[in-house]
């Protein structure tokens, strides 16, 4: 736009009505995208001025960002995270039974706090409770099925053109025809089956045949961090999404692999139990698994032409 502004708009057609009926997770994902935009703007020498939910009557516009010219007010902590954006991936692989240094845990906690959220690493009985809640949610999903999951797990084809036909990238006649990438969870990123350990890795391949998929032992004492906020409204979800992405980018920069454990978050009767009743924190927005291991595979993303509209 001529006024150097960017509107972040939600695509409600891509929501998950069964796992995310309030669209809380959708807001978290958009918050993460907003943080990446802020990092990219800082890297390019602009200061992003952000307003969350700028129009109360427009639920689709989640944020407006105005790019201000370079000045002394640039946040020099954000720009170095730019190179971590393409490297941050979800790893569904085993992590080493190796502690995360306390100094690094404290650094990640500080990153969440700087974005207006809080983060806590789980230990002792609280870690065991959260693992049990996630396992219960996973068992329920195995029994009940997951209609949303079926929409987003990609088996076989990972690329298609705009007609939905399979495309072999090596045989494209027009190098400008990039086709349309099917985003989601492709088969090659599912990771191995877990035959031991307690790492809360979601098995997206349940009920599907994957003969070449190996089984491996996962960590027995996973490192889990909770992202939580004081309240539980759309603006809080956007704040938490930015905090989540900042934590993940810094973790990636520091050599940590990561994944999400959302199973219990998708069941209201279990989500409220995730919080620690002793320190009485606010609602949990995300459970993050961190550790030392493979970063995971690169996965397709929505085509830029399908997600970005430039207005005069």
Where are these regions (language model features)?
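Acidic, surface-exposed loops and disordered segments
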Residues: 1-312
């Amino acid at each position: 736009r001529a006024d150097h502004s960017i509107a972040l708009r939600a695509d409600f057609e891509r929501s998950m009505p069964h796992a995310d009926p309030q669209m809380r997770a959708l807001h978290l994902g958009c918050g993460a995208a907003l943080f990446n935009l802020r990092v990219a703007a800082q890297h390019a020498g602009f200061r992003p001025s952000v307003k969350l939910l700028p129009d109360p009557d427009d639920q689709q516009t989640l944020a407006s960002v105005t790019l201000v010219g370079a000045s002394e007010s640039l946040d020099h902590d954000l720009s170095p995270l730019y190179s971590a954006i393409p490297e941050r991936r979800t790893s569904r692989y085993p992590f080493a039974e190796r502690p995360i240094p306390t100094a690094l845990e404290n650094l990640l906690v500080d990153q969440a706090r700087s974005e207006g959220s809080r983060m806590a690493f789980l230990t002792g009985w609280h870690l065991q409770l959260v693992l049990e809640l996630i396992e219960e949610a996973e068992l329920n999903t195995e029994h009940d099925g997951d209609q949303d999951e079926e929409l987003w797990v990609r088996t076989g084809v990972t690329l298609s053109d705009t007609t939905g036909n399979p495309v072999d990238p090596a045989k494209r006649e027009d190098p400008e025809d990039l086709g349309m990438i099917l985003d989601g969870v492709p088969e090659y990123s599912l990771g191995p089956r877990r035959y031991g350990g307690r790492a809360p890795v979601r098995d997206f391949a349940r009920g599907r045949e994957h003969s070449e998929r190996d089984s491996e032992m996962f960590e027995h004492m996973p490192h889990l961090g909770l992202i939580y906020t004081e309240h539980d409204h759309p603006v809080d979800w956007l704040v938490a999404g930015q905090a989540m992405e900042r934590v993940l980018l810094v973790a990636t920069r520091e050599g940590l692999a990561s994944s999400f454990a959302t199973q219990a978050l998708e069941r209201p009767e279990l989500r409220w139990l995730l919080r620690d009743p002793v320190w009485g924190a606010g609602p949990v927005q995300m459970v993050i698994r961190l550790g030392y291991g493979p970063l995971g595979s690169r996965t397709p993303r929505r085509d830029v032409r399908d997600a970005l509209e430039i207005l005069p």
